[in-house]
């Protein structure tokens, strides 16, 4: 009888020992499998894809953008140079386009692997870019400036620069202001500087005593309001060369309709 009891106890011990080993082996195998699985949340994973929206600063042979407000990319840098690797580039209609087709102010959806090189501008490599919109307000400012630029072209004769007072500009980031100034440089092929009348006089650029800007004209946009819903800007504007050479208008309006900006002048003046 005692032998039978001993055999039963021995059998139970062996069963428990064998089960414990099996559980331990199973647990180790599970950990090994988890360690070998890739972390799909890792932005450095070559197969991962990250997208963000950005606005075009410059485009052509290369692409420079500024990330949208609140994006992780903006935390890295306010300017990003986008490298091209077998790029897929589409317009808003899904048609293939080239970098040369992009314009300053275009809003892009950019796909990349999540890697941002720390430099200034920061650098990424993109595999796909899609145009999803455009900043029409930038074009609105350019339209207002171009309208006054073409008024009384005699004031523009024999100049070397265009000075712009940007202190009254609204609804624009500093980079968007730079986009406008860069676009002016390309459009008019003159040196573009910024400053108020007094700032330019303090720098000796404007002769304050004789009220004369020998080498340029001074353009001022002021009294600006913007209705984003109707895409309408109200403004006053002036172009100044001297005390006896200036033009402008007050309470003018710029409206975006049918894909373009139109200017309606308010009360005009000349001196």
Residue ranges and their predicted role:
Residues 1-29:
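Sec-dependent N-terminal signal peptides of Gram-positive bacterial secreted proteins and lipoproteins
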Residues 22, 27-33, 38-42, 53-58, ...:
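Flexible low-complexity loop/turn motifs enriched in small/helix-breaking residues
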Residues 62-64, 234, 262:
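General beta-strand recognition
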Residues 93-96:
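Short, solvent-exposed loop/turn positions at domain surfaces
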Residues 113-119:
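Short, charged beta-turn/beta-strand-edge "cap" motif at the junction between a beta-strand
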Residues 249-271:
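Short beta-strand edge/turn micro-motifs at domain boundaries
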